[in-house]
Design a protein with these regions (language model features):
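N-terminal intrinsically disordered/low-complexity leader segments
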Residues: 1-33
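Amphipathic alpha-helical segments used for helix-helix packing
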Residues: 116-141, 187-193
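Hydrophobic alpha-helical connector segments
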Residues: 83, 97-123, 176, 180, ...
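Alpha-helical DNA-contacting segments of helix-turn-helix folds
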Residues: 74, 81-91, 95, 129-131
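Hydrophobic/aromatic-rich alpha-helical bundle segments in the mid-to-C-terminal region
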Residues: 129-132, 162-209
Length: 217
């Protein structure tokens, strides 16, 4: 009887642990889905009406969740906006790293990096998002840890991997890194707020030629 009781206890204990883990897994999955829905609806609203005209009330209405639930994920709309920028920057960082591995020369690296960037932000929704929220995107991006890492990696590459003769001072490489990061979004905004249409390939080719000439010639 003692053996049976012990076996039953062990079975119930194991069941309790497994059931608890399953519950936690489902709960975490549900939390992730809610967060993704908030970010999706937040992006849609920021893209259609702009950050300044978007409120928590608007987001929770579109997301079909309680207002209190929103604050379990973000303290305000600014933090949700920052999370969107951080996610975009993570995708940009991953694309740069992949391009770095695949490129056989400096020009290919520059072109591939710029082309991937323009394709990531070149959808109709992302174009509108950038046009309506220029100042907020700049502020959020340059405070982003991901952007700081991208600048740091570029600075390292420029100083060590590329045979650049025109620049020798450390501060010059840092400024070059900032220009490589800052130029694409400014060119993107300038061209998408005019009536002149440029393809992603044209924009990427122009920047690649420009920076290749500056860096290598």
């Amino acid at each position: 009887m003692l053996v049976v009781d012990r076996e039953l206890q062990e079975f119930l204990s194991a069941y309790s642990v497994n059931h608890s883990n399953s519950f936690l897994g489902k709960r975490d999955e549900q939390k992730l889905k809610v967060r993704e829905r908030l970010m999706k609806e937040g992006l849609a609203l920021f893209s259609s009406t702009g950050f300044e005209k978007t409120t928590v009330a608007h987001i929770v209405e579109k997301s079909e969740i309680a207002r209190g639930t929103f604050y379990n994920y973000f303290p305000d709309t600014q933090k949700l906006f920052d999370a969107l920028i951080e996610e975009l920057n993570q995708n940009i960082k991953a694309a740069i790293q992949q391009t770095r591995r695949d490129s056989k020369n400096v020009y290919d690296y520059l072109y591939g990096t710029f082309k991937n960037y323009f394709e990531l932000i070149g959808t109709p929704q992302m174009i509108q998002f950038h046009i309506l929220n220029q100042a907020h995107i700049r502020q959020s991006s340059y405070q982003s840890n991901v952007i700081k890492t991208i600048v740091k990696n570029l600075n390292r590459d420029l100083k060590s991997d590329f045979k650049i003769k025109a620049f020798t001072e450390k501060y010059e490489f840092l400024l070059l890194s900032f220009m490589l990061v800052g130029s694409p979004p400014e060119l993107f905004l300038a061209t998408h707020t005019t009536n002149i249409n440029f393809s992603n390939d044209q924009l990427a080719t122009f920047l690649a030629k420009l920076f290749h000439k500056v860096l290598m010639e």
